[in-house]
Amino acid sequence: MKKIIYIIACACMMGFSSCADTFLDLEPLDSRTDQVYFKTPTHFREFSNGFYSQLFGWRSGITGHMDLQSDLVTSRNGEQSDIGYGALVVNDKDACWDIYNSIRTNNILLQRAESYAGDPREIQEYVSEAHFFRAYNYFSLLQHFGGVPIVLVPYDTGDSRLKAPRNSRYEVVDLILSDLDKAIAGLPIEQNIADADKGHISRQGAKAFKARVLLYEATWR
């Protein structure tokens, strides 16, 4: 009898030890890295939601798609006089360069989608959003600078490719249109977007933005 009790006790201890190992072997929930993220469609959804928070407001200084860059709207605070007096200071930390931070997040999702172990259709919408926002961001850069360096993967800070020369305007436009075509193919139509997700980019919205890009380039070419 004692032998049976001893065997049962040992088995229970081994079971508890196994459960404890499983319980303690958890991913940190307070700080996630790329290596432990992007394993479920929910991860991709949560990450893609961040694209919308990176959009610039109308008072941010990035107004490339708005009438604030035209002669329809002007400032009353005298900033234009700085140009005449030669007092305008060039700022190399302008918000324009922050667009590359947004492009990096787009590239991270696209890179992780390539190694996603599940059904690609589960994350198709979020991948399409990444393509759309990368096109949107490069169009902002195009409007400000013309040709810019094209970055398609999330480089580390010490990567020598970060100092690559700028690509031509035509190459940037080709990338924008290619990304928009991929976005259009995978985004849902507006009628199929749930009420809780209204405001997310739809297929119709991506088509409208592509039309804007084509019209903008038609005036330049």
Label for each model-derived stretch:
Residues 40-49, 53-57, 77-145, 161-174, ...:
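Conserved, well-structured interaction surfaces
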Residues 1-28:
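Bacterial Sec-dependent N-terminal signal peptides
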Residues 19-62:
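Membrane-proximal, proline-rich intrinsically disordered regions
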Residues 22-23, 59-63, 141-150:
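Proline-centered turn/helix-capping motifs that create local helix->coil transitions or kinks
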Residues 142-143, 149, 191, 216-221:
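Short coil/turn linking the two alpha-helices of tandem helical-hairpin repeats
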Residues 131, 207-213:
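TPR/Sel1-like alpha-solenoid repeat signature
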Residues 147, 151, 197-206:
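Aromatic-lined, polymer-binding surfaces characteristic
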Residues 29-33, 84-88, 153-160:
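Short linear capping/connector segments at secondary-structure termini
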